[in-house]
Regions:
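Double-stranded RNA-binding/processing signature
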Residues: 1-162
Length: 162
């Protein structure tokens, strides 16, 4: 585990937006680590691909993949995060996407602070295996990257060199 849980902190009393703040960092680290491990892209391209995984739009779709897997307690945390969203929204997101992404980040932050990195990894694996980001770079669902210049970025993803 990268960081240790802090049982002395009552996580259930924390602000959902504070949990989302932590969850945002958790997701960013997971995505960046996985991209570095599974691709040979240049740093600028890594950043471009990573931003598509962590956008509010993407998080809304990622949440749809894992929502059926959530326990009742996790669903309650997710709901708290969705309901805590600020009135303002991100530039490139709808209000619904922004609320969902805040709830998703709240859940990740809560799981992390509870020391449930095993659960985070389980949920992230489902996302990584099943989510295709919509991005400006060409991404094709494909099990092999046999096109000239294409590099594998994740299981079943190829990003064509530009």
């Amino acid at each position: 585990m990268l960081f240790e849980a802090h049982p002395e902190i009552d996580i259930h009393e924390m602000s959902p937006l504070a949990l989302a703040f932590a969850g945002d960092a958790v997701l960013e680290l997971l995505v960046r680590q996985r991209l570095v491990e599974t691709s040979r892209l240049q740093p600028g391209r890594l950043h471009s691909v990573a931003t598509h995984y962590v956008s509010a739009h993407a998080q809304n779709q990622e949440l749809a993949l894992i929502e059926p897997m959530l326990t009742e307690e996790e669903q309650n945390i997710l709901r708290r995060g969705k309901n805590a969203s600020k009135a303002s929204v991100a530039k490139h997101a709808t209000a619904q996407e922004y609320r969902a992404s805040t709830g998703f980040e709240c859940l990740l932050g809560w799981l992390h602070l509870m020391g449930r990195d095993d659960r985070i990894e389980e949920l992230f694996e489902t996302i990584w295996k099943n989510y295709t980001p919509e991005q400006e770079v060409t991404v094709r669902r494909n099990t092999s990257c046999n096109k000239a210049g294409a590099q594998q970025t994740a299981p079943a993803f190829c990003v064509a060199a530009q």
